[in-house]
C-alpha cells in the first residue's frame, strides 16, 4: 500500500479523469468540507481545546500575503499530531483573547507555562487567558538580544 500523498492531477492521466472536476467533487462532496462545523469561522480562528496541555508556546507568523496569525501550540506534541491548540487571524489582543476564551476556564487553568517572545501583546494575551501560567521567554530571543547588545558595546 502506498502511503505517500497524491494529487488529483496525478490521477488525471492513468484514470482518464479531469483533475479540476475531480478536485471540485472531492472538496464539495467526498471530503465533508461543506458540512464541516468549523467552516463558518475557520478563516478567522480555529481552536482545538483537546490539544491543550501544561506547557504551551505562543507566537505570531505570516502565512501568506503578509497576513499575520497567532499560533498557540502544545510543546509536549513536539510539532506533531495534537500540537496546534489555536490558530487565530491577526495579533490584536482582543481578537486572540476572544478566540481563546472559547476554551473552558478549567482547561485554561491547567496551563502552567507559556513560552513566548518579548511581545507586549503576547504577554497580555497570556495573562488574560492563562492566569496560572508562568511566562518563559524563548531562548532564541534572549540570545538574539544579548548578541545585539554585545555588538552595540563592541561598536562603541
Q: PLM ranges: what are they?
A:
Residues 23-128, 132:
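RNase H-like nuclease fold core
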Residues 117-120, 126-156:
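Conserved beta-strand -> loop -> alpha-helix junction used to position metal-binding or nucleic-acid-contacting
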Residues 7-28:
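Short, basic interhelical loop/turn and adjoining N-cap
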Amino acid at each position: 500500500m502506498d502511503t505517500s500523498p497524491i494529487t488529483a492531477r496525478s490521477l488525471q492521466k492513468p484514470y482518464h479523469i479531469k483533475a479540476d472536476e475531480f478536485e471540485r467533487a472531492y472538496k464539495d462532496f467526498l471530503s465533508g468540507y461543506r458540512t464541516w462545523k468549523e467552516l463558518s469561522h475557520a478563516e478567522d480562528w480555529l481552536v482545538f481545546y483537546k490539544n491543550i496541555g501544561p506547557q504551551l508556546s505562543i507566537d505570531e507568523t505570516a502565512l501568506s500575503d503578509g497576513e499575520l496569525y497567532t499560533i498557540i501550540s502544545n510543546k509536549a506534541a513536539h510539532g506533531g499530531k495534537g500540537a496546534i491548540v489555536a490558530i487565530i487571524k491577526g495579533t490584536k489582543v482582543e481578537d486572540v483573547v476572544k478566540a481563546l476564551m472559547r476554551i473552558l476556564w478549567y482547561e485554561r487553568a491547567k496551563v502552567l507555562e507559556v513560552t513566548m517572545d518579548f511581545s507586549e501583546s503576547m504577554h497580555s494575551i497570556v495573562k488574560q487567558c492563562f492566569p496560572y501560567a508562568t511566562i518563559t521567554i524563548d531562548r532564541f530571543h534572549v540570545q538574539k538580544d544579548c548578541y545585539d547588545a554585545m555588538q552595540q558595546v563592541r561598536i562603541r
